[in-house]
Amino acid sequence: MKPYQRQFIEFALSKQVLKFGEFTLKSGRKSPYFFNAGLFNTGRDLALLGRFYAEALVDSGIEFDLLFGPAYKGIPIATTTAVALAEHHDLDLPYCFNRKEAKNHGEGGNLVGSALQGRVMLVDDVITAGTAIRESMEIIQANGATLAGVLISLDRQERGRSEISAIQEVERDYNCKVISIITLKDLIAYLEEKPEMAEHLAAVKAYREEFGV
């Protein structure tokens, strides 16, 4: 685990974005942890979040021309990541996002920001079922652009309805790499460093045994 990944886990815990306990997911699964990126909701939170996304992007080595944030949650992520890349990595790259409803006046179409072209890095909070990615792919392809990769905050590394995860399905269906700031493996490594969290570690490991990929 790299220093920025440990810092991201601590940041998420401090904002209660990441919680340990017992939670029922939308799928009905009982999970020993919960991650709600919507609680990164202040100016300082967003500034820090962008730095973590930018760090993971640079660390990945994936080459891309433009950041795309799918509406709605991806919009502030794309914006703050673009700012962080410019301020901290001297990479001044364009960004773009879609609006859910097409506008019939003023700025045309359902895209805002730079023209959607070249190699696109899609940024979002998490991938649950991959629906937002599939919708975004239609937009990307319709504009003649290509998907360079996908960056999310957390990869839960668990099976979806099939034997592989929603993330693995996206990688298979779109022949792209999905990267994340942290994974379930990183969470476990973090918990292993914290004796006071042994109870949570046991629960997360048991969950991975049952649902992990």
Curated annotation (Swiss-Prot):
Assigned keywords, A-Z: Glycosyltransferase, Magnesium, Pyrimidine biosynthesis, Transferase
Enzyme class, spelled out: transferase
Classification via Gene3D superfamilies: 3.40.50.2020
Pathway: Pyrimidine metabolism; UMP biosynthesis via de novo pathway; UMP from orotate: step 1/2
Residues that bind orotate: F34, F35, T128, R156
Entries under InterPro entries matching the protein: OPRT (IPR023031), Or_phspho_trans_dom (IPR004467), PRibTrfase_dom (IPR000836), PRTase-like (IPR029057)
The UniProt record lists the keyword Magnesium: yes
EC number(s) given by UniProt: 2.4.2.10
Keyword Transferase part of the UniProt annotation: yes
Reaction(s) this enzyme catalyzes, per UniProt: orotidine 5'-phosphate + diphosphate = orotate + 5-phospho-alpha-D-ribose 1-diphosphate
Function as written in the Swiss-Prot or TrEMBL entry: Catalyzes the transfer of a ribosyl phosphate group from 5-phosphoribose 1-diphosphate to orotate, leading to the formation of orotidine monophosphate (OMP).
Protein name stated in the entry: Orotate phosphoribosyltransferase
